[in-house]
């Protein structure tokens, strides 16, 4: 069986991570949560009260990012600290576009992601996987959904985790993040020329997963 590379890109809350995790489990692939890696960098910036990219990188080099299978799914670790929940707070979410747009941060993360992906048998999701991180990926998906639907998804996710959230404010924040991600100079959100556009508005997670898995199995 061929060890393929799958890249799933798309805007915030389009369902990329949820879909990628399910496909990884179903097809026996490694799931590399690139968004979580940038969220870790953002968390470090907030906790260390710095926007100095070299200091953020040095901290992560001293406390490496790793992923582990926990009781409730994949866990994100920084050194020995479990940051799975804290990197999903609104404070981190609203600052991640700024930190992830730093050239030094992106170069550091991309190098790490490419190193891990070299062996294949991997699925990654993010903003620039198909265009920058894995331009040679066997299968590229660009997953989109309406702002209203994405806000509703994030709203329900936050409530289930006990995070107080205002739905209308979420809509504004997601639309603004779309704008920032699309116009930033370094690796803007952009569909790769050879990516398959998949609009998930009104579709169930099961339907999205099935569509992508059918494409992937033909390449394995």
UniProtKB/Swiss-Prot annotation:
Cellular compartments annotated: Cytoplasm
Catalytic activity line of the entry: CMP + ATP = CDP + ADP; dCMP + ATP = dCDP + ADP
SUPFAM superfamilies reported in the protein's UniProt record: P-loop containing nucleoside triphosphate hydrolases
GO cellular component: cytoplasm
Top-level lineage group: Bacteria
CDD domains: CMPK
InterPro entries linked: Cytidylate_kin, Cytidylate_kinase_dom, P-loop_NTPase
Example of a GO MF term: dCMP kinase activity
GO biological process, alphabetically ordered: pyrimidine nucleotide metabolic process
Residues reported to bind ATP: 10-18
One Pfam assignment: Cytidylate_kin
EC number: 2.7.4.25
Keyword tags: ATP-binding, Cytoplasm, Kinase, Nucleotide-binding, Transferase
Family per record: Belongs to the cytidylate kinase family. Type 1 subfamily.
NCBIfam families in UniProt: cmk
Protein name per Swiss-Prot or TrEMBL: Cytidylate kinase
Gene: cmk
